[in-house]
């Protein structure tokens, strides 16, 4: 056989639902890679003969290989920080109170408007490096800290540039409807007009976004405004998704389902009608335990209902300066289990197969199957559950991206 590399002495959590074992596991396995894709995968005892003198062989020392992790919800291109708001919250101020007083998203907007692309790129690269060290091979990056055409485009350009200069694949999302900027404080409909008539066409003209998102909440945009933005995005051929049901239940999830959204994110206040709608539309539920933890929320997402209706559950970092300044997917695995009572297998699926579904890329990544992209990680662990069980010592030993060893 002519392959580019072979991995042996490994166990593989394929996350392939067609394999009945937990995690889609194959123990005592081997993987062969050719032209950036998985060419062979199965028990080591069934590995076809190959020329060991000409093909690189990597030995996993009994560790576990998983698909490369996918962080399907981040805001990692931003300037400044909001440590002062952290102190205010510890003194009793709520996220909504801070936002209504002009803090929150708007304070980061001001910092991003002042920053140039070089500064934003450098900050973003540091954060992307941190995720990559934990086995992340694909990440979604949202805009939303510009709230004017120039700065929204600037953030999206930086996100695209990060993807061009880093081994991690970057999917970009235009989130101009993240908050109402000060200049439109009493005219949110006018700002929605600006998004639809000026911002979105400019984003499309430069091919800067793979999807469009809206923060559908009582401190941001109502259902009618959300539908206007997402309908315009769909008409332009872009995927749609939304932040919804984080602070209240406005019916955003049912709207998302009706529009065929890829995902609804946060969903702490999601009810059974919303869960049923997501199930019927195939929309993913993105759980963001970092924000739940950092904001000290008490209303948990309806995990049992999501299980009952078979809605794909995704885990993501929501890395951002205000509500989840936590740049770690491994910590999300632990939080998903300890805070939301996911099983370790559900948590890992939420950062692999289901995360790929939320980004519309499940045909190429998210599970380890012959023909899919060779994106995988080797972990120094005895069982996949260890990834969620323990935090603090990074067990990621090797990362293969598009068939190339990028971290060792």
Curated annotation (Swiss-Prot):
Residues annotated to bind N-formimidoyl-L-glutamate: 145, 320, 322
Record Pfam families: Amidohydro_1
Pathway: Amino-acid degradation; L-histidine degradation into L-glutamate; N-formimidoyl-L-glutamate from L-histidine: step 3/3
Cofactor(s) needed: Zn(2+); Fe(3+)
Family, similarity comment: Belongs to the metallo-dependent hydrolases superfamily. HutI family.
Protein name: Imidazolonepropionase
EC number(s) from the headed UniProt entry: 3.5.2.7
Binding, 4-imidazolone-5-propanoate: 82, 145, 178, 246, 323
Gene of this entry: hutI
Broad class of enzyme this protein falls into: hydrolase
Annotated residues for binding of Zn(2+): 73, 75, 243, 318
Entry's Gene Ontology BP terms: L-histidine catabolic process to glutamate and formamide; L-histidine catabolic process to glutamate and formate
First-listed, main subcellular location of the protein, grouped into a coarse class: cytoplasm
Cofactor binding description: Binds 1 zinc or iron ion per subunit.
Compartments, record wording: Cytoplasm
Catalysed reaction equations from the record: 4-imidazolone-5-propanoate + H2O = N-formimidoyl-L-glutamate
């Amino acid at each position: 056989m002519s392959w580019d590399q072979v991995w042996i002495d490994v166990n593989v959590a394929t996350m392939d639902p067609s394999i009945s074992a937990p995690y889609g596991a194959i123990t005592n396995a081997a993987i062969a890679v050719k032209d950036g894709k998985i060419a062979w995968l199965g028990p080591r005892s069934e590995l076809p003969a190959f020329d060991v003198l000409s093909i690189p062989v990597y030995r996993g020392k009994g560790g576990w290989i998983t698909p490369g992790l996918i962080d399907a919800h981040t805001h990692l291109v931003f300037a400044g920080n909001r440590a002062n708001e952290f102190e205010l919250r510890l003194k009793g101020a709520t996220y909504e109170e801070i936002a209504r007083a002009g803090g929150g998203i708007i304070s980061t907007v001001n910092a991003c408007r002042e920053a140039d692309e070089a500064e934003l790129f450098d900050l973003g690269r540091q954060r992307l490096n941190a995720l990559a060290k934990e086995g992340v091979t694909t990440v979604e990056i949202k805009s939303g800290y510009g709230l004017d055409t120039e700065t929204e485009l600037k953030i999206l350009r930086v996100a695209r540039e990060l993807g061009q200069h880093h081994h991690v694949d970057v999917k970009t999302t235009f989130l101009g409807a993240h908050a109402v900027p000060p200049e439109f404080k009493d005219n949110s409909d006018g700002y929605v007009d600006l998004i639809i008539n000026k911002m979105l066409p400019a984003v499309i003209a430069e091919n800067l976004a793979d999807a469009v998102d809206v923060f559908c909440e009582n401190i941001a945009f109502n259902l009618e405004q959300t539908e206007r933005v997402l309908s315009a995005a769909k008409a332009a051929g872009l995927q749609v998704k939304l932040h919804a049901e984080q602070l209240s239940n406005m019916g955003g999830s049912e709207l998302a389902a009706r529009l065929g959204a890829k995902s609804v994110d946060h969903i702490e206040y999601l009810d059974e009608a919303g869960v049923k709608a997501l199930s019927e539309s195939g929309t993913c539920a993105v759980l963001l335990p970092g924000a739940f933890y950092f904001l000290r929320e008490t209303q948990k997402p309806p995990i049992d209902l999501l299980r009952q209706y078979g809605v794909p559950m995704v885990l993501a970092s929501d890395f951002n300066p205000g509500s989840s300044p936590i740049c770690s997917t491994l910590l999300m695995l632990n939080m998903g289990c300890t805070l939301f009572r996911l099983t370790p297998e559900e948590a890992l699926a939420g950062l692999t197969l289901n995360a790929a579904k939320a980004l519309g890329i499940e045909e190429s990544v998210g599970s380890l199957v012959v023909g899919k992209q060779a994106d995988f990680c080797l972990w120094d662990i005895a069982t996949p559950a260890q990834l969620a069980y323990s935090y603090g010592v990074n067990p990621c030993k090797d990362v293969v991206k598009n068939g190339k060893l990028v971290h060792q």
